[in-house]
From Swiss-Prot:
This is HTH-type transcriptional regulator LinR. Positively regulates the transcription of the linD and linE genes that are involved in gamma-hexachlorocyclohexane (gamma-HCH or lindane) degradation. This degradation pathway allows S.japonicum UT26 to grow on gamma-HCH as the sole source of carbon and energy. Residues 23-42 bind DNA. Pfam families: HTH_1, LysR_substrate. Residues 6-63 form the HTH lysR-type domain. The keyword Amino-acid biosynthesis does not apply. One of its GO terms (molecular function) is DNA-binding transcription factor activity. SUPFAM superfamilies: Periplasmic binding protein-like II (SSF53850), Winged helix' DNA-binding domain (SSF46785). It comes from Sphingobium indicum (strain DSM 16413 / CCM 7287 / MTCC 6362 / UT26 / NBRC 101211 / UT26S) (Sphingobium japonicum). Belongs to the LysR transcriptional regulatory family.
């Protein structure tokens, strides 16, 4: 068997397999019986002379060859869609696609709820999947098409990556109403308080600068918990007497639900821009452009 024995149905399956890293998940997405998807993967492996997906600790992982061709496969499928539409005007209500959004937990909270609310009538057949990656992984995922858009503050995402400002974010300190620092807002009470710090180490996120500032200025004995998630940190803050320094707009809304109060940090915390990032090859893709425009519209208005 060689590559000439494959048709576009195999490319559709390959695209789903490389995005899902799972035969069963790809079969569900394409509404195929799992044996059919498994047989299709076997044909792809034989035709391309590569395993494509190999077993790993947490499921299956693509081979280097599979990662190298993922973007090409997606481009071929997009070209086929364009040819099938015969130059028709793009209409989101006919769009059937899952978009993959990379970012932190709070970015996903903002983006996924905003997109669901805004798109459920305009594009009822679209869906959205959240993915959390390191900075290096994010660039690669945008390049290969494994991720459609990244949302957050990632200053190092530059080579071949387009970007657009969504909104400005600043920091507040959150804690229980009776906490001495929450009552006073004074530097001495801030330094004397016990803190929970969120770490974004390895994610190339702008929050890293604030994390370093907190670790540099607060005595190590006062750093009681270092968490990897803002949402986990907020829940821990609610269950304790800890102070959490976090982005104001998103965490502030949730803090109200928990009954927490917010005050301005007594030490300088640089504000940052939340942006959306995408690869240049998607710049003129109609579905991708629609997603970016919708995201910009709803977030710049809501935030």
């Amino acid at each position: 068997m060689n590559i000439d024995d494959l048709d576009f149905r195999h490319l559709v399956l390959l695209d789903a397999l490389l995005k899902r890293h799972s035969v069963s998940a790809a079969a569900r997405e394409l509404d195929l019986p799992q044996p059919t998807a498994s047989h299709g993967l076997a044909r792809l492996r034989k035709a391309l002379g590569d395993p494509l997906l190999v077993r790993a600790r947490d499921g299956m992982e693509p081979t280097p060859r599979a990662e190298a061709i993922a973007g090409v496969v997606q481009q071929l499928l997009e070209l086929r869609r364009d040819l099938a539409e015969g130059g028709q005007t793009f209409s989101p209500d006919r769009l059937k696609r899952e978009f993959i959004i990379a970012g932190s937990d709070i970015a996903h909270l903002v983006v996924l709820t905003a997109l669901h609310s805004a798109a459920r009538f305009e594009a009822p057949h679209t869906s959205y999947r959240a993915l959390t990656l390191s900075g290096d992984e994010m660039v690669s995922a945008l390049e290969t098409g494994h991720v459609d858009i990244a949302v957050g503050a990632y200053p190092s995402l530059v080579a071949g990556i387009k970007t657009q400002r969504l909104y400005q974010e600043e920091y507040l300190c959150f804690g229980k109403e009776g906490h001495p620092f929450i009552k006073s807002g004074e530097t001495d009470d801030f330094m004397a308080a016990d803190h929970i710090v969120v770490s974004t180490k390895g994610m190339a996120h702008a929050h890293r600068a604030v994390e370093r500032a907190l670790l540099d200025k607060i005595h190590p004995d006062r750093i009681r918990i270092v968490a990897s998630s803002f949402l986990v940190a907020l829940a821990a803050c609610f269950e304790s007497d800890l102070i959490l320094t976090a982005p104001a707009r998103v965490i502030g809304r949730l803090a109200e639900v928990y009954g927490l109060r917010a005050v301005r940090p007594p030490i300088l915390m640089e504000a940052f821009e939340v942006r959306q990032y995408w690869h240049a090859r998607n710049q003129d893709d109609p579905p991708h452009r629609w997603l970016r425009q919708l995201l910009h519209k709803v977030l710049s208005a809501r935030m």
